[in-house]
Amino acid sequence: MPHHHSLPTSSADFGDFNSAPASSIQTSSLSQDDLLGSYDETIRHSPSVKSHPSPDPRASNLDLLFLDHNAEEHRRPEPTYSPRSRPTGVLPESVPHARSPRRLSTFSSSTSPTSPPSITDAGCDIIFHPFYDHMDVNATRAMQKMQGHGERGASKRSDKMQLRGQASHSRIAPSSSPPHSRLLDTLATTTKLASKWRSVITHPTSPNTADQTHNGQPKPQIRHAETSPMDITHDTPFASAEQIAGSYIPPTGAPGFTQASVLGMKHHGDGPFEPLTLIGRKDSTSNVLTPEDAIGLKACLPPRQRLTNQWTLLFSLDQHGASLSTLYRLIDIYSVSHQSSGNILVIRDGHGNRFGTYMNEPIVKREGTYYGSGESFLFKLTHSCQTIPYRWTGKNKYFALCEAGFMSFGGGAGAYGLILDSTFTHNSSATCPAYNNDILCELEPLKSQHAQSFQCLGLEVWSTL
């Protein structure tokens, strides 16, 4: 009867395997390094196994800015190679060049006190290491299960590869750096210029450092010379109406505009306005204004009236008669062609006193209205040919009131500094608020609002232009 053999079962095979005779080959002769070496050789020849690829620069930038790793993991394809141990270094086949492009590697997980992290200055670049993702953790766990008892040998080999891989790294950023320092370090990885900016940001220069020398001594501060106020001692021909009136006090440093200098102006014989010519007067005419008086009086005029060296006689009591209407007519004719001309009226009384007024415009008839400006003034001429001006005080604007029956200069409070009737027979002078003048017909200085009458023996009107 033929003997039928039943198919072996898995339990039978397992039993046969357990009952196999002991092998004559001693397994103790194979070291753990040989087992790991055969495993590495298999990975090396496998077409699907590659060295740890350099991450995408764009992904690295996102990782450095602490974005979500899970979102990147979902977009990453599943690995097609068998799990292997967690890489703690760089494989010999993927060791980067000395001047490698920007790449990211992993943090060193070595806890051996005899293996400190290697810090070099290769390339003067700063390369930072991202955290592990979940794929690396799963691969590590699977590899530990497969290697089993070769864990110690793999750890030793990993330490050797770690030291080799750390030689290609530049600097490892401390993991305990504060969040703001890590953010600045991340920005510094782009270019060398960014690294310099990081040093400026993290170590700002003290504002006092720029003022110190290399010895630490402060630089001497440069003091600019302060401009001291200049004392003005010269007289000035320029003055406003207030300054002419004597009631204006100029600010400190104003060029010569002081009341003392304006009121104390004296004519010097060698002045720039020499000589002054008086024209229009006949030789037979008894003069009232002499050339010496004219030179002293010219120094008191406004600047624009000093530009000419020639004065023209418009009216003379000795030449044209005692008529106020004739005076108005002759002045009006001349003013048509000389509208900017000023007029000087000079009187000589029965005691030989000479006095008068200056108007910055022609003396014409204007019924019922005052006219003139602060440049106008009353004056007295001394026997030594000096001029004493009485300028506008600013209290009112009663400079001149000229009508058909009379003409007056200076007014206020019912008093007139100088007033003459139409025939020059009833004339008087008093202290008026407009000029605060002395009584003009008195030899000695006297102020009074009571009018003092005088007899007019001579009268002349001159044009300054």
Swiss-Prot record:
Keyword Ubl conjugation appears in the UniProt entry: no
Lineage: superkingdom: Eukaryota
Biased composition regions of type Basic and acidic residues, renumbered to the chain: 148-162
An individual GO BP term: response to oxidative stress
Keywords of this entry: Mitochondrion
Domain TLDc: 287-465
InterPro entries cross-referenced by the UniProt entry: TLDc_dom
Family from the record: Belongs to the OXR1 family.
Function noted in UniProt: May be involved in protection from oxidative damage.
Name this polypeptide is given: Oxidation resistance protein 1
Organism in which the protein naturally occurs: Cryptococcus neoformans var. neoformans serotype D (strain JEC21 / ATCC MYA-565) (Filobasidiella neoformans)
Gene: OXR1
